[in-house]
Each structure stands twice: as structure tokens, then as C-alpha cells.
UniProtKB/Swiss-Prot annotation:
Entries under InterPro entries matching the protein: Chaperonin_GroES, Chaperonin_GroES_sf, Chaprnonin_Cpn10_CS, GroES-like_sf
Name used for this protein in its record: Co-chaperonin GroES
Presence of keyword Cell division: no
Organism (species): Parabacteroides distasonis (strain ATCC 8503 / DSM 20701 / CIP 104284 / JCM 5825 / NCTC 11152)
Quaternary structure annotation from Swiss-Prot or TrEMBL: Heptamer of 7 subunits arranged in a ring. Interacts with the chaperonin GroEL.
Gene Ontology MF term list: ATP binding; metal ion binding; protein folding chaperone; protein-folding chaperone binding; unfolded protein binding
Family: Belongs to the GroES chaperonin family.
GO cellular component: cytoplasm
Location within or outside the cell: Cytoplasm
Length: 89
């Protein structure tokens, strides 16, 4: 993958959605919740007012409506501003 986010943006690979409930019921694709965590795979350079706190490899939590979904090499990613990242886990 050859993509580099600009300014204060980060590229995140979302965690896989749950396939089954704790009781063993298989969840159909139409009912799966969007995961709210993922791994940082690329980081921009930041801005003159804001340094980048997150780094490649960090696992993070983000808001439900944060970011823009993109597809690269057949895989789904989210690109969002660092401010949309809620926490590093």
C-alpha cells in the first residue's frame, strides 16, 4: 500500500466486526455494528499548530461517525483527522 495521509490525518484499518453473539447466534452482515476501534497504519506529518500524538501500530478508539471509508487493494480503511481519535488502547 502506498498512501500517505496529509496534515493531521490518519489511516486506520478497522477491527473485524463480531460474527457471532455470546450465545452463538450468527449475525448477518446487515445487522453487524460498525467497529469503533482499529489499528493506525499510516500517519500524516501534523500541522504547525498540532503535532501527531498517534503513531503507526497504535490501536485506537474512534467515534461512530468519524472518518471517510476508503478501499485500497481490496481492503477497507478509514481516513480521519487525529482529533476524531478518542483514545489509544
Amino acid at each position: 500500500m502506498n498512501i500517505r495521509p496529509l496534515a493531521d490525518r490518519v489511516l486506520i484499518k478497522p477491527a473485524a466486526a463480531e460474527e457471532k453473539t455470546l450465545g452463538g447466534i450468527i449475525i448477518p452482515d446487515s445487522a453487524k455494528e460498525k467497529p469503533l476501534k482499529g489499528e493506525i497504519v499510516a500517519v500524516g506529518n501534523g500541522t504547525k499548530d498540532e503535532e501527531m500524538v498517534v503513531k503507526v501500530g497504535d490501536n485506537v478508539l474512534y467515534g461512530k461517525y468519524a472518518g471517510t471509508e476508503i478501499e485500497l487493494d481490496g481492503e477497507k480503511y478509514l481516513i480521519m483527522r487525529q482529533a476524531d481519535v478518542l483514545a489509544i488502547i
